[in-house]
Design a protein with these regions (language model features):
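Substrate/ligand-engaging "lid" and interaction regions
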Residues: 1-225
């Protein structure tokens, strides 16, 4: 993050009388705090970045003001929060709190670049990162991660010629195909039932977005009784 604070685990022992720098923020259960941040807040942000870039937006406020993107980001976040609640007992914020966050992002003064939020997509598509991690946690608790896997699918379309990982991602898909790309970048074990199911959810979303695997019909045919 580019925030001017540093979260520090409260259990870390400093010498007696040590004066903490003003940018230190002490947190209990730092590991759980980081999981919560990455698998919910960062999940939502990268959904805005991947989808917003796909639809030609440059900044997060532009993406948030697209109703479809906003809905997908909200429901992906909600899936992740429900899984975190099941696994760690973390409460799910109410919709009013989410509304405040979305209104902040939608402000014309909040112009964070999507290229910054979505940068290094290969890292963000890895198994334990902000998308695949919570998606697998959802499946562990019998929550279908439909919108998270949709975000992953949009991530497979992510393009930025100034981003080395984005270029590598698209080159790999071009050379090896989307199916191999999903297992490779998301680090999925196809012999594992849960991970195999996740693979197919991602693939189905990708094909639907790309409008592939659709049976063509002749729309000019005239039907008579």
């Amino acid at each position: 993050d580019d925030k001017d604070i540093l979260m520090v685990d409260n259990s870390f022992l400093f010498p007696d009388g040590y004066q903490y720098p003003s940018f230190f923020v002490l947190k209990d259960n730092m590991e759980i705090n980081m999981i919560e941040k990455i698998w919910s807040e960062n999940l939502r942000h990268v959904t805005f970045a991947f989808m917003g870039t796909y639809y030609g937006y440059q900044t997060i406020n532009q993406a948030v003001n697209n109703l479809y993107i906003r809905k997908c980001a909200y429901y992906a976040w909600k899936e992740g929060r429900l899984a975190l609640n099941e696994e760690y007992g973390l409460p799910v914020p109410d919709d009013e709190a989410v509304k405040v966050e979305f209104e902040k992002f939608a402000s014309p003064f909040f112009r964070d670049q999507l290229s910054r939020i979505g940068r290094e997509p290969i890292r963000k598509l890895k198994k334990n990162d902000r998308l695949v991690g919570p998606a697998l946690l959802c499946m562990k608790h019998r929550i279908i991660p439909y919108f998270i896997t949709r975000s992953i699918a949009y991530g497979m379309f992510y393009q930025d010629q100034n981003d080395k990982e984005a270029v590598e991602l698209q080159n790999y898909i071009s050379d090896h195909g989307i199916e191999r790309a999903i297992t490779h970048f998301c680090e999925l074990d196809m012999d594992d039932v849960m991970e195999n199911s996740l693979f197919h959810l991602i693939l189905c979303n990708y094909n639907e977005i790309a409008k592939t695997n659709i049976i063509p019909i002749n729309e000019n045919v005239t039907y008579t009784n």
